[in-house]
Curated annotation (Swiss-Prot):
Pfam families: Pantoate_ligase. Belongs to the pantothenate synthetase family. Homodimer. The reaction proceeds by a bi uni uni bi ping pong mechanism. Pathway: Cofactor biosynthesis; (R)-pantothenate biosynthesis; (R)-pantothenate from (R)-pantoate and beta-alanine: step 1/1. It catalyses: (R)-pantoate + beta-alanine + ATP = (R)-pantothenate + AMP + diphosphate + H(+). The keyword Ligase applies. This is Pantothenate synthetase.
Amino acid sequence: MRTITTIAELRDALAEHRRAGRSVGLVPTMGYLHVGHMELVRRARGENDVVVASIFVNPLQFGANEDLGEYPRDLARDQELLTDGGVDILFAPGVSDMYPRPMETVVDVPKLGSELEGAVRPGHFAGVATVVTKLFNIVQPDRAYFGEKDFQQLQIIRRMVEDLAQPVKVVGVPTVREEDGLACSSRNVYLTTEERRAAAIVPRALDEAERLIASGVTEPAEIEKRVLEFLAGEPLARPEVVALRDPETLEPFGEISGKPVLILLFVRFGTTKLLDNRVIAPKSARFAKVA
């Protein structure tokens, strides 16, 4: 695997592959990789001639009181994992490489990006959309791979690509989970032993939402209320977002019918924010209907 830190060198390296007619897949990350990231790499490796992974902790998507300085980093470990995963090129620029001057241009998807997680992290998704657009411009991939764990982010990127006619296929990859169901995340390392134990309630809260839907509850507000009550059973859990939405538009709706439903959770444990979600098809919910 070749590690590249400058835009010019990366463009030169990719030009050779383009001239040879090879397809390029991009896996954008902020590093400190886990098995969820490696599933993105596995998908990219199986679907492209050349795989580029990027590691860049993007300051534009961190708020003033967020964990930019503390975000976990271990480039040597990440390089080893990516090499073992069959990545051809690692693009690992510094902030001065990506943003040599203060950014005057921002890409924003304001409607999708201002609700749910965006409501408690203002500006976050504009930072995500801006850096992803810049990576797309630099790499010009045929396909780009994102985890479904960050479902709102995935839908924002899909809408951005559609609106701007960016020539890339966005591939969503199902969430990879730990043994107790907790979604794999680089931020899981922040959890204390007690917080990690408590965090298992997050996937169980998704189970509770699915059980309620299977039992015939059709009012989103009632399901949200009961999921909040379920989370209240864990004293260390501080839910910030519990929302049922349309999985395509992320908009609220009046009543559950036969269409798929997105349940999205944003829960704090101490200083750590955990995201999770599930798309539930009411007619095929995994839990037996309650009489």
